[in-house]
Amino acid sequence: MTVRDVIQKIEPRMKKTIEAFQHELASIRTGKATTALLDRVKVEAYGSQMPLKQVGNVGVLDAHTLTVQVWDKSMVGATERAIRDAGLGLNPSADGQNIRISIPPLTEERRKEFVKLTKKFGEDSKVSLRNHRRDLIHEVEKLEKEKLISEDELKRGKKDADDLLHKYEKQITELIAQKEKEIMEV
């Protein structure tokens, strides 16, 4: 096993961290209607908590309105409650088997809360990236102890780990800035 093999093993985990962070960002309100906004909503259905996607179709009606077409009419009330109680500041209204959700404009205070949440998710993702870097360095040091690589290769491996970390941390920082701009846009 070489340093390159270790990097090829760890880098996909770093990419997954970025993807997970992007998914988290998609669920944060910006004032525009997106289906990802309701990704975290869980509905009490048939005795268990189910993701909203498994209870009905979520769609965008216009820039400020989402719709949920609930498949089982008996689930409309529970779905409406779940959306209201999700802590997103949304007030759904049922119309037969369809639920309309108007996305109200964000208050300045709410925008700042969402920016804080974005930064928290970003910091959590950076911690995860640092843990992957630590794992990479640990693997490379193990190879050096087993005399499978030289001391120079160990140093190069550590530098590569740092470079990889900086590359992905930079992506997270850029995503945070982009989301912050979206949130603060009135």
Curated annotation (Swiss-Prot):
Q: Which GO terms describe its molecular function?
A: ribosomal large subunit binding
Pfam families in alphabetical order: RRF (PF01765)
Localization: Cytoplasm
Look up the domain of life of the source: Bacteria
One of the protein's GO biological processes: translational termination
Naming one, the record's GO cellular component terms include: cytoplasm
Q: Which InterPro entries match?
A: Ribosome_recyc_fac (IPR002661), Ribosome_recyc_fac_dom (IPR023584), RRF_sf (IPR036191)
The record's annotation in SUPFAM superfamilies points to: Ribosome recycling factor, RRF (SSF55194)
> Which UniProt keywords are present, listed alphabetically?
Cytoplasm, Protein biosynthesis
Its biological purpose: Responsible for the release of ribosomes from messenger RNA at the termination of protein biosynthesis. May increase the efficiency of translation by recycling ribosomes from one round of translation to another.
Give the family this protein belongs to, as stated in its UniProt record. Answer: Belongs to the RRF family.
Q: What is this protein called?
A: Ribosome-recycling factor
The scientific name of the source species is Chlorobaculum tepidum (strain ATCC 49652 / DSM 12025 / NBRC 103806 / TLS) (Chlorobium tepidum)
The primary gene name is: frr
